[in-house]
Design a protein with these regions (language model features):
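Surface-exposed molecular-recognition determinants
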Residues: 1-108
């Protein structure tokens, strides 16, 4: 059995893309009129990282941002600062993985 979840960019609503991390914070401009309210990240050049999810209901703020790893049964982690709000998208902080290529899906 298989299941497929397909995502697409819809201008001003959602953004699909990729980003290369280098150890420095990076702003991901999604073209939103306000910051992202949902962010899904997955590393593509390594199997060591899972599916990371942040959402505004749990809190995407400057400071600690709760996240879930979808591929585990673990509880929400609440004591990390891996992403921050950015006027038209989100910022991946330098506290997150220091390298790698990541795909993302963000919703305004």
């Amino acid at each position: 059995n298989f299941i497929a979840y397909l995502f697409a960019t819809a201008s001003g609503v959602s953004k699909v893309g990729s980003v290369s991390l280098t150890g420095s914070a990076i702003n991901v401009d999604c073209g939103f009129s306000s910051g992202a309210r949902f962010v899904l990240l997955k590393r593509t050049d390594s199997t060591t990282a899972g599916w990371w999810v942040w959402n505004s209901a749990s809190g995407i703020v400057s400071g600690n941002d709760p996240y879930l790893e979808l591929n585990t049964g673990s509880a929400e982690v609440t004591n990390t600062d891996y992403i921050d709000p950015f006027a038209s998208g989100f910022t991946i902080t330098n506290n997150f993985y220091s390298a790698g290529t990541w795909i993302f899906y963000a919703i305004a």
